[in-house]
Structures are given as C-alpha cells and as structure tokens.
Amino acid sequence: MSSSKLIDLGRSYQNRAYRYARNELVSRKDKGPTGGIILADGVGLGKTYEALATVATILTQRQHGKEKKRRSQYHILVLVPPRLLTKWLDELILPDRFPRYLEDWNTPATRAVRDTFRNVAVIRGMGSLYEHKGKLRNRHNQLPPGLYLTKSTIIKKQGNKASQLRRTPWDAIIIDEAHHLKHPLDNKETQDLLAHNDAATLLLTATPFQLSPSELGGILEATFGGYGISGDVGKARSKAADLYYDDNFVEYREALQRLFREPTPADKRIAKRLKEPVSKLLRHRIIRNRKVEQRMYYLVDETGKPTRVGADLFRSSEVDICKTLEQGNAISLDEQSELAYLRVRALLSRLASGPRKTFLATSLRQLLSTYGQFRKTKVGRSEDLPQLPSENKHPKLVSVTRLARGIFKDEKSNLKSDNWIRKALVFTTYVGAEPGEATSKILGERAHGSAARLKRELEREMKRIFPRKKRRKERGAILKALLKVIEEHGSALVDDEKPRLQNVLRGFAGRPVTLLLLSPKNRPGALKKEMGVLRGDLEALSEQREMQNNESDEEYSEEMDRRRNERSRALFETILHRYSNRDLVARYDGATKTEERDRHLRGFNTPFAPLVLIASSVGQEGIDLQKYCAHVIHYDLEWNPAKLEQREGRVDRHGRILKGPINVYLLICKGTYDERMLHVMVNRFRWHHVLLGNRRYLDEVPGLTAETQAPPDLMNLALDLAPR
C-alpha cells in the first residue's frame, strides 16, 4: 500500500479511517469483487473528506503498475440528496477545501487523479446529463472521464433515461446519506448501478439505522453490490444476510434487546463475551469514529427561561427524567390551553374507538405544535372540536419567542471587540400537515415578529451608539473599506459581476447588524478581518479563472470550459451571498426555493444576517451550520433519536469558529403527549448508541467528560467499530 500517494487530513482519526477503508477495498480488489464500505463516523467528524481521500489514494494505487495503461483521468460518481449539491460543490471546488490536499499532485502517477477532481460536473437533472458529451462503447452511450456530482433522485426517478449513469464504467462511487437507501437492492436502478460496476463504493451515514437495527442489514447489502456483476444480485444479498444474521451477531443483538427491557446478569455476560467477535466481524464493512459531544441541554418553561438539565439528559433513566419534569422546568399550560388540550384528547379518544379510527399520536403532536396546523387537519375541522385559544397564545410559540428574545438580549450585551453574535437554529416538524400550513411557516411568521422586535432593539441601539451624523459616517467608512478591496483585488470579476457586488455592499453597509458588528469606532479589528475575508475570496476567484485560462484538454475542450465556468460562477455566488441577506430571521424548508435556501445557508455561516434560521426536516441532514451558531432549539421532538442527533450535528461539528459548548433547548409541554415522546426517545437513544458506540474519545471539552456518553454499564457492552 505504500506505493500510493497519501493525504494528511490533519486529524489522526480521519487519517486512520480513510487509510483503513482504502486498505480494505484494495485488498478485496485482489481477491474478487471490490464492493463497498460504510463510513459511519459520528455527525460532524468529516466523513466527506475521508471518502474523497479514500477514493484519491485508491486511484493513485492503480496508477502504480496496477493497470496496463495509465489513464489521463478516471470516472468518479458522487450521489447526494438534492439539498446537499451546493455543500458538496463547495467542498470540491473552493480552494481552501479538499482541493488544497491535491495541490502538489504533479507527478505522472498523481496528475490524473488531481485532474479528475478538478473536472467536476454537476448533474441536477436530465437536461444537464444530456449536455455532457458521451462516447459509444459496447453500444452504450457513456459519460467521459471526470467527477460527476449527481442528485441521487435521478437514478431512481428517471429509470432507463439515466442509462448513461448506470452504464458508465465507474472507478469509484460515493453515496452520501446512505441510510435513506435502507434496502438498496430492492431498488432496480440502484441495483443496476452497483451490479454493472466493480467500483470502490463508499456509503456515508452517521446513522446507519434509524428506528430498527434491521435497517443496518439493508445498507450492508450495498457493500456487497459488486457480487451482482454477473447479474446474480441474490448473491450480494445472500452475503449481506450471512453477515447480519451471523450467529454471534444475532445472539448479541437479542441479549441487548432484553437488557433494555428486563436486564439479567446472563444477558450482560453474553453481550460482553460477543462484543469483540461481533465488532471484528462488522469492521470489514462498517467503521465508525465517535467523539464527546460538545452540548449542554436545557428545558424551557412558559416564560422562555431555560434551566440546565446537564449534558446527559438522553442518557438518563426514566425515573430521573420524571424527576426533572416534576421540578417545573418544562412548559406549564395555562388554564385555557390545558382545558383545550383535555377536551381535544377526549374527542380523539372517542374518534379512535369509532368506525373511522384516527391516529391519536399524530393529532396530539399537531395540537402541541400549533393550533393553526391542527385546525387544517380532518380532526381539526370536526364539528365537535372545542374552542381553541388564539394562535398567539399557543404555549410553545409564546415560549420560543421569549426564549429567542432572551438569547439575543444576552448576546448583544456580551458582544465584545473580539467575538461575534452567536446565532440560533430552530428545528420544527411538519407532523403530517400540508407544507402550506406547516409548522415552519406558522412559526416563521411568529418568529418574524420576534425578529422585528430584535431589529427595533438593534436600531435603538444604533441610535444610542451612533447619532445620525455619526451613523452616516460609520456606514461610509465600512463601504469605503470594502469597495477599496474590490478595486485592488477584483480584477477577476467579469461582465456585470463588479457592479452587482458593489450594489450589494452598498445595501449591506447600512444595515443595523453590519454597523453593530463592523463599526470602525467600536470594533476596528472586525472591519479589518472582514476586509481580509473579502480579499481572500476575490484572490481565490482570480486563481480559479487564471487556472481556467491556462488549462486545456484537447478531447473535451468545450466540455471542460463549460465546467470550469460553472465553478467560477459558483465561487462568485458564494461571495455575493455573504452580503446579500437582509432578513434577521430566515427559513430553510421545502417551501423555500432552492436558490433562496442556499443564500440563507451561506448567510447563516457568516457573522451577519440571518441571526435565526428556522429549519424543517430538509435542514436536519448534510448541511454545515456550525461556524457562528451556538444555540439549537428543538421546537418539536421526534420519535427517532437519530433525527435529533442529525439536527444537533449541524452545529456540533469540526470547523466551529466559536468556542465553548452548544446550548440545546427542548420545548416540552408538561403533562402532555410530549412527555411520552421523550421517554420513548430516550430508550431508543440508548439502543442506538450502544450498538454503534465505541470508547475512543477524540475530543476533550472543558466540563464535558466521558460520562456524557451512555451509562457505563451499557458502554462496556458497546461495539467498537473504530478503524485499527
């Protein structure tokens, strides 16, 4: 393995993971079908870079005499959910992201790999797929070499129309958020893709199973996909079943299941005895690094006051949870809200026992989310429905509004010359409602009211700090400094890019948040820092366009030119989005246009607007929101603890600029169905962390120790899937 070029990702656990995956896949290539491996690192540990480094080093291994003829480029396919296209594109093309690891790859053996990673094509739909010139081989139209960043939905929805993707001889395939596959070989198109390519396949997921461990068995099928090359997909499925239903694995899982219900000393002995053999068995197909989470949990009451309940809430026993709730830290319903809840629950009980049964749990969750959402349901339109309070009096909406106001009041008072305002991320759930009446929309309207109050407070603060004359002077100083950077370093801007950026900066310089954060008088260092950021972005764009002018490809010159232009446009849009957000509160949900979502996401990762991002399930996976965010608010709970893990992982990940733990707030209505959900979720959380946990602690955070993992008696039984 030493003959291949190695990459230093900067963190020992990442290097250990990708090198283990590379060695495992290369050794299989010498024996038979390559198949795949699951990279299941905890949320925020850098699976994207591990996968890219694995692919790059595997391909350089092939260049060292493994292939009869050296190739100028390779075929790499990256399948990602639609909402993650922008994130992956940034990682692949921005100079300070993954490309920096390949800068010195100039030898004959590494140049082909470097050029492949530079030759990025984005496949958003069938139109963009048809744009790429293919060539005929074995009567099939195949794609030319390059790295194809592709929406995963194309494979499933387009069927035979996407035959170019399935018939291209891929050297490597990366599938992000692979837990959505569940049973990939049940999908004919995915089955075709894996069965016709003996590609090194990497499946990325922090949560290999959601509610049932059997889902892990489904994903394991994809790691044996190479056995379907002969057309015998049943062989791939059979080998996955052999692994998942291995006698030791079955006995281990059954013992753990009994431990969570009626624990006995015998079950503990069984699990402890089988822990190492089962870990060794699974490590050939799945590897996982874990870290100590940097989180502090709070319960919020009806006044919006948060009370800390420790970093180990989800590892607590049911008795401890009951004691915590009894202490009065959750949301207490007022008399009107409590009466409405009891009457609706009685109505639902009658309907549940009637001829046309209704689902009690879903209806109660809708009621506890917002009254507006509940009124739009079939039950909510019932003639027997009791009178509900007005929307503005919903206990959760009142609580979250007061909480947000309190958070930013503290943030504003703690703002110093060397720090920034720490932002808040609010997660909501549709709970079966139509998108037009979704919780995120209703909460968004309510939160915008809070944002309006916050804006007024900021404007009053501006008037106090800056009299009108001085305010105009401060705005002018900020604008002059940023426009000077454009004049000195904006030579790469083409067409109308320069005036567009200048116009955006004129609006940006006069906003209250900008004056508060970049005031040359109050925070002189902040403006200099922002000038450096803009200068670096413009220089990166200049380097990209200079490289674009110097590079050439005789066979695919027109195609390569189109792809490089696309990369340059993406870099410019990234610069533009930093300064173009106006709303202090923004939404990231399915009802928001993709372009607007991308703008909000990029703005949230800057010190400026938006300060609050309200996200639905669309925003709980795959995106990075960690740079300036320190507050995560769970407006609704989920039955699935893996979803909460994914939510909090948007912020608890490497790359945070802010120091200290993340504050996680739970809104739970006392004496309601929320309490039931919390108990169920805690039990499932234990099962999830024991089956996929390990004892390798990667980070040490002040105030957070190893005891913030699962209870010690269960952690001693947890599988260790860390790479060796």
Task: Please identify what each model-predicted range represents.
Residues M1-E24, K29-I175, H179-A200, L204-T207, ...:
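Helicase motor interdomain insertion/brace
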Residues E50, Q626, R653:
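Short, electropositive, low-hydrophobicity segments enriched in small/polar residues
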Residues K69, Q626, K659-G660:
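Short, flexible turn/loop "capping" segments at secondary-structure junctions
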Residues N160-K161, Y628-A630, R647-E648:
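Amphipathic helical hotspot of TIR/SEFIR-family domains
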Residues E215-G218, D624-L637, N663-L666:
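A short beta-strand element within the Helicase C-terminal
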Residues G225, G660-P661:
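Glycine- and acidic-residue-rich phosphate-binding/metal-coordinating active-site segment common to enzymes
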Residues N640-G660:
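Conserved SF2 helicase motif VI
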